[in-house]
Structure formats: structure tokens, C-alpha cells
């Protein structure tokens, strides 16, 4: 695994949990001797939903709700088998979605 890199994308609705998870991953990778680039904040997706407040009429009265998806990118350069093993055992919060590419 000398010339490979691991690219980790994290997604979450809460940016505090996301930053804590990214910090755990960076700390774990650095403890095993790998070089780390990141966490890089990626653009936040904003999903807006507009609904009518009334059930049958009054179309002018509407309400908008939004949900923001925060994203981070971490590159682990020259990972060792020890790094991969440590990352597989890492326990992260339930609200964080993780995508890993080799």
C-alpha cells in the first residue's frame, strides 16, 4: 500500500458531530504513521421544502423548511496495513455517513 491513498468523505446534518468524527479519523491515522491531508470542508447542500400552511386554500400562506448536509473530505496518503486496521476499528457517532475509496 505504499503508493495508494485512502479518500474518506464524511456527511452529516450536524456540523459539530462531523468535525469531531473528522478529528478522530485524523488523529487515528497520524498515530499509525500515515500522512493526512484534511479535513477539507466541501460545499454544504441545502435542501428546501415549501409547504402550504392551510390544508385546502390560502396559497399565499406558505412555510419553508430546510435541511443542511455538511461534508468533509480527508485524504490519507501512504497508509500502512496498521492504519487500515485502526480505521476499521474506529467507533464513530451514528449521525455520520462515511464513504471510503482506495
UniProtKB/Swiss-Prot annotation:
- Please give the InterPro entries that the UniProt record associates with this protein: Ribosomal_uS10 (IPR001848), Ribosomal_uS10_CS (IPR018268), Ribosomal_uS10_dom (IPR027486), Ribosomal_uS10_dom_sf (IPR036838)
Keyword annotations for this protein, in alphabetical order, are: Ribonucleoprotein, Ribosomal protein
Entries under SMART domains matching the protein: Ribosomal_S10
Give the GO terms filed under biological process for this record: translation
Q: Can you provide one Gene Ontology molecular function annotated for this UniProt record? A: structural constituent of ribosome
Q: Which Gene3D superfamilies match?
A: Ribosomal protein S10 domain
PROSITE patterns found in the cross-reference section: RIBOSOMAL_S10
Superkingdom of the source species? Bacteria
One Pfam family hit: Ribosomal_S10
A single GO CC term for this protein reads: ribosome
Q: So which residues are the signal peptide here?
A: none
Its family?
Answer: Belongs to the universal ribosomal protein uS10 family.
Q: How does it assemble?
A: Part of the 30S ribosomal subunit.
NCBIfam families per UniProt: PRK00596.1, rpsJ_bact
| Protein purpose | Involved in the binding of tRNA to the ribosomes.
Q: What is the recorded name of this protein?
A: Small ribosomal subunit protein uS10
Amino acid at each position: 500500500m505504499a503508493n495508494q491513498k485512502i479518500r474518506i468523505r464524511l456527511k452529516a446534518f450536524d456540523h459539530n458531530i462531523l468535525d469531531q468524527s473528522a478529528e478522530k479519523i485524523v488523529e487515528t491515522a497520524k498515530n499509525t504513521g500515515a500522512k493526512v491531508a484534511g479535513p477539507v470542508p466541501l460545499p454544504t447542500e441545502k435542501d428546501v421544502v415549501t409547504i402550504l400552511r392551510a390544508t385546502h386554500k390560502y396559497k399565499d400562506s406558505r412555510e419553508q423548511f430546510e435541511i443542511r448536509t455538511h461534508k468533509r473530505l480527508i485524504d490519507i496518503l501512504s497508509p500502512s496495513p496498521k492504519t487500515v486496521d485502526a480505521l476499521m476499528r474506529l467507533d464513530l457517532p451514528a449521525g455520520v455517513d462515511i464513504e471510503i475509496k482506495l
